[in-house]
Design a protein with these regions (language model features):
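Exported/extracytosolic protein signature
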Residues: 1-299
């Protein structure tokens, strides 16, 4: 190219590259170009009697540059420069939801929780989900049985740790057991997603969903009036520097409620009302069960 002087005289060219599947969240994608130029179009420039100048870069020739650019470049021929541009891969996002907020939070009542993790297209390493079932000294209890099991949904995910899309491919789920309290951990590991050219379509939206149930723990520390809250933490590798990125979300606090009943029993002489009974009389008992004024839940 020949570029004349003047602000209006520029050359522009465009090229495209494809982001590789190995790209990780928050990884900075750098692209650097090196360029050189000459002081004249070539040797055939009539600046002397012969019509040709000396070899490019020589003392009697044109000044030029070299690519790749030497480091350091101490040569007089230093007509060279670089230009860089960069962009970053998107981070993960997550949300924690109580799918049944209207459920009365009494001892043993199951609440349905869901953690949704949205991943950028590419590869995510060391993906871990922790759910804190306990709060302020009281804890939900995880249910994992035929009636209330843990389930997973994998949307636009290709593999987990190179294997199938199921819990067996996770690095570890040792704490995700029936009756667990405190913190349960899904160590998912490495996930590879499906991918597409988002310039032309946006049908691929990688997502992992964990759905599970927990209930207020029936122990001596969980009682009427206690506040309970459930929170989740997601960690994963920063693709640029390898540090750990952390995401947090929690559900609304719920107050534990319990039924408190009072029972009264009365007896009367059905054979001779108002008279003390004797042998052969029929006694009638009336039992009355009602909520105490302090009761906060159906029984």
């Amino acid at each position: 190219y020949e570029i004349l002087t003047g602000a209006a005289n520029t050359r522009t060219f465009t090229f495209q590259v494809r982001v590789d599947t190995t790209a990780q969240p928050l990884e900075i994608l750098d692209n650097t170009i090196e360029a050189k130029w000459d002081s004249l179009p070539g040797q055939s420039t009539a600046l002397n009697a012969t019509g040709n100048i000396a070899a490019d870069g020589s003392a009697l020739g044109l000044r030029n540059g070299t690519v790749p650019i030497p480091s350091p470049n101490t040569d007089v021929n230093d007509y060279e420069t670089t230009a860089s541009a960069s962009t970053s891969v998107l981070p993960l996002t997550m949300s924690k939801t109580d799918l049944g907020p209207a459920v009365v939070n009494t001892i043993g009542a199951h609440r349905n929780f869901e953690v949704v993790i949205d991943l950028p297209e590419g590869t995510t390493n060391n993906l871990v989900v922790e759910d804190a079932l306990s709060f302020g000294g009281v804890s939900y209890m995880l249910s994992r049985n035929a009636s209330f099991d843990v389930s997973y949904t994998f949307e636009d995910i290709v593999s987990i740790n190179g294997g199938a899309l199921d819990e067996a491919s996770f690095t570890s789920v040792a704490t995700v057991v029936d009756g667990a309290t405190g913190t349960v951990t899904w160590n998912i590991g490495s996930g590879i997603t499906a991918e597409e050219d988002d310039l032309t379509q946006t049908n691929v939206n990688p997502r992992i969903i964990i759905n599970y149930h927990a209930r207020p723990n029936n122990d001596v520390t969980t009682n009427d009036g206690d506040n309970m809250q459930n929170s989740a933490t997601v960690t994963y590798d920063n693709g640029e520097d390898g540090t750990t990125e952390t995401l947090n979300d929690n559900t609304l606090a719920q107050t534990v409620v319990e039924p408190l009943l009072s029972i009264n029993k009365a007896v009367s002489n059905a054979s001779t009302p108002g008279v003390a009974p004797v042998a052969g009389d029929v006694l009638e008992y009336v039992i009355t069960i009602e909520h105490d004024a302090a009761s906060t839940s159906d029984a």
